[in-house]
């Protein structure tokens, strides 16, 4: 499953909190995505104080921003969250003249359908969510060349799932031969039913 993370400028007016100082940058990001030493270096070189908060899922981030109460300058959601944030009026346009390094970003990651012309977001990085396993602790017949292997009875209470609704439903869709971008209700129900069958093998999320 491919995921892209993007910086977005959050509309502070959506928050009931103070707009803060021009010498303070409030960032809302995934946990463990920026080294604290890098933040210290940024503050030392710029004189700008960074208030850094973290979240563990796009849904948690979106809920907190929607509810207000905290004012953020920058948030780092995955690509599929951008469109919802735009529709809810949670973002403000980015002035590209203030981002000279934009020219150094691979064009394959720019001007994508969820944000044409990158009006509201700038790519941060991208990666994949995969399957990691210890071959010494599983049955020899399991190769994980097929999603079906995860449903093998020998894996009862041995699987840890990532805490991400899109990643999990995407796995369910892939397991029935469908794209994770499917919107058809019948296929989504089929994928959900298949995930329910996987539950005996899940130890934790």
For each of these PLM feature ranges, what is it?
Residues 1-5:
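Core hydrophobic alpha-helical transmembrane segments of single-pass membrane proteins
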């Amino acid at each position: 499953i491919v995921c892209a993370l993007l910086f977005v400028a959050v509309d502070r007016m959506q928050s009931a909190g103070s707009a803060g100082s021009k010498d303070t940058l409030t960032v809302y990001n995934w946990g463990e995505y920026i080294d604290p030493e890098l933040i210290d270096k940024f503050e030392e070189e710029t004189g700008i104080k960074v208030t850094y908060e973290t979240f563990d899922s796009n849904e948690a981030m979106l809920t907190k921003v929607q509810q207000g109460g905290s004012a953020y300058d920058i948030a780092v959601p995955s690509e599929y969250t951008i469109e919802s944030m735009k529709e809810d009026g949670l973002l403000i346009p980015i002035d590209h003249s203030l981002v000279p390094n934009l020219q150094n970003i691979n064009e394959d990651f720019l001007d994508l359908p969820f944000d044409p012309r990158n009006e509201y977001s700038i790519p941060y990085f991208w990666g994949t969510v995969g399957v990691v396993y210890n071959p010494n602790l599983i049955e020899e017949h399991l190769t994980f060349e097929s999603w079906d292997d995860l449903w093998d009875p020998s894996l009862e209470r041995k699987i840890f799932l990532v805490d991400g609704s899109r990643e999990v439903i995407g796995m369910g869709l892939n397991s029935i031969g469908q794209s994770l971008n499917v919107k058809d209700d019948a296929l989504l129900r089929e994928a959900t039913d298949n995930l329910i069958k996987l539950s005996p093998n899940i130890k934790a999320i």
